[in-house]
Amino acid sequence: MLVSATEMLKKAKAGHYAVGQFNINNLEWTKSILLTAQELNSPVILGVSEGAGKYMTGFGTVAAMVKAMDKELGITVPVALHLDHGTYEGCYKCIKAGFTSIMFDGSHYPFEENLAKSTELVNVAHNLGLSIECEVGSIGGEEDGVVGMGECADPDECKTIADLGVDMLAAGIGNIHGKYPANWQGLSFETLDAIQAKTGVMPLVLHGGTGIPADMIKKAISLGVSKINVNTECQLSFADATRKYIEAGKDLEGKGFDPRKLLAPGADAIKATVKEKMELFGSVGKAE
């Protein structure tokens, strides 16, 4: 069932585990993630970037597909449909389309402007029963054209945004979107600890979950991270499985060219990746 992310993240924070946000790009992605969450009895957040939303012909199409698929597959675990790294305008489009959760990424604005826009969107979202995530300190790498260098957020600025009543807070702690470079310095647990001390029970969000070592993930969860975003890793798994299918010539065997057969190995690879992450994050069996 589609719900806001508020309750699942409160439970994750209290239970010292994290809920995975897995970004969707099409029907196969969505189906694979939903089925895995149901199989493992885990809450899940479906992330949609503005670029992916545009690719799928608009947020209205995405919301309709997810709601219908959730119903037709008989999904009973909590599912939040969440805008990832939303612009100010994108947030309003997703609210209108029927998303249950939004993220406003105002990290590229001067702090006061980020604060003003975040305040407005928190009030709008909560009046509609939606959850909202805001960001302080840009996350490294590139996300739909927004480039961040992996900076660390100011804990005092994090507290100011948290005090607005956001449901989850994304704070830069040296994390990066996409593949991590060989010279990456790792997560700044000192920064995370300081942010946790300032924000208390606020669920914290770790973006760029792909490629972070398992021990760092577990330590981040112990320091208050309750939501971890995964996108690139599913894309790499999908691409690798699809490549092997083609290179083995299976598309030339019988009706192996049928998209339902051609895309099946990739879909299975996404399921395996999502399962691995849910087990690592500790969310298996936590759906209520």
What kind of region is each of these model predictions?
Residues 3-11, 15, 27-52, 57-76, ...:
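Alpha/beta enzyme core
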Residues 17-25, 50-54, 261, 265:
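A short N-terminal beta->alpha junction/helix N-cap motif
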Residues 19-23, 81-82, 103, 204-207, ...:
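Short catalytic-loop micro-motif centered on adjacent basic/acidic residues
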Residues 20, 145-148, 182, 207, ...:
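A general structural-boundary detector
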Residues 21, 199, 213, 259:
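Metal-dependent phosphohydrolase cores
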Residues 173, 208-210, 232:
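Active-site proximal loops enriched in glycine and acidic residues that flank catalytic Cys/His/Asp
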Residues 239, 243-244:
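Glycine- and aromatic-enriched membrane alpha-helices
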Residues 246-288:
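Extended, intrinsically disordered, low-complexity segments
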